């Protein structure tokens, strides 16, 4: 009898824990750039557009809205600036979504007043705080975590102080096997592609630079 009661108690606990775990997903036009102060990666994101939460604490994501905008015979890719969205976790699954943008007019309206919706699986709206993330430095996407940390330390509208961390600038690199410490990176070029090549070349160690130069000579 004791064993049966213990088994039932364990089963109830497991059921309670399992029901508490929620999945945060996005609409097809929204991508996660950062989750709770960390850059979104395969270790954080279960699939392309989802991750798990197991508490009702405050959470924060940085998202980007992307749409193919068709106008006449041309199609253009729209990608929004990073948007910080802070919300309270729930025991339900959550979806983060953005309106469908079909025209340049929709895009301009969204740029002026971006609205990211957060709802539970049952359709209840989750209160949020959201605003654009200020982007600083060369290749701001590379400095996303640093920019987000500075934002969270600033006490801004959607900031979460506990997600502010002290980080070295990405351009400084790290030391260790196969790595070299980097100082200030200076780039020049006619276009973004050329500047990016210069940036990453200067970030690489000597062996990688040599391999790249040998490859480039063969092209």
From Swiss-Prot:
Keyword Signal attributed: yes
Keywords: Signal
Listed InterPro entries: UPF0319 (IPR018635)
Signal peptide positions (record): 1-21
Annotated S-S bridges: none
PANTHER family referenced in this protein's UniProt entry, alphabetically: UPF0319 PROTEIN YCCT (PTHR38108:SF1)
Family: Belongs to the UPF0319 family.
Name listed for the protein in its UniProt record: UPF0319 protein MS0844
Naturally occurring in which organism (per UniProt): Mannheimia succiniciproducens (strain KCTC 0769BP / MBEL55E)
């Amino acid at each position: 009898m004791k064993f049966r009661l213990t088994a039932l108690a364990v089963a109830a606990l497991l059921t309670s824990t399992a029901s508490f775990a929620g999945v945060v997903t996005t609409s097809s036009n929204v991508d996660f750039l950062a989750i709770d102060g960390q850059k979104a990666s395969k270790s954080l994101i279960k699939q392309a557009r989802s991750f798990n939460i197991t508490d009702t604490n405050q959470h924060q994501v940085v998202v980007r809205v992307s749409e193919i905008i068709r106008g006449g015979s041309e199609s253009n890719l729209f990608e929004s600036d990073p948007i910080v969205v802070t919300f309270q976790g729930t025991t339900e699954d959550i979806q983060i979504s953005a309106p469908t943008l079909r025209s340049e007019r929709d895009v301009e309206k969204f740029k002026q007043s971006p609205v990211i919706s957060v709802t539970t699986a049952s359709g209840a709206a989750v209160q949020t705080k959201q605003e654009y993330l200020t982007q600083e430095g060369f290749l701001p996407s590379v400095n996303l975590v640093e920019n987000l940390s500075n934002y969270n330390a600033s006490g801004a509208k959607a900031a979460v102080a506990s997600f502010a961390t002290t980080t070295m600038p990405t351009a400084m690199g790290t030391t260790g096997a196969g790595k070299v410490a980097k100082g200030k990176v200076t780039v020049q070029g006619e276009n973004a592609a050329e500047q990016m090549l210069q940036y990453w070349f200067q970030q690489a160690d000597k062996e990688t630079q040599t391999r790249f130069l040998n490859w480039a000579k063969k092209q």
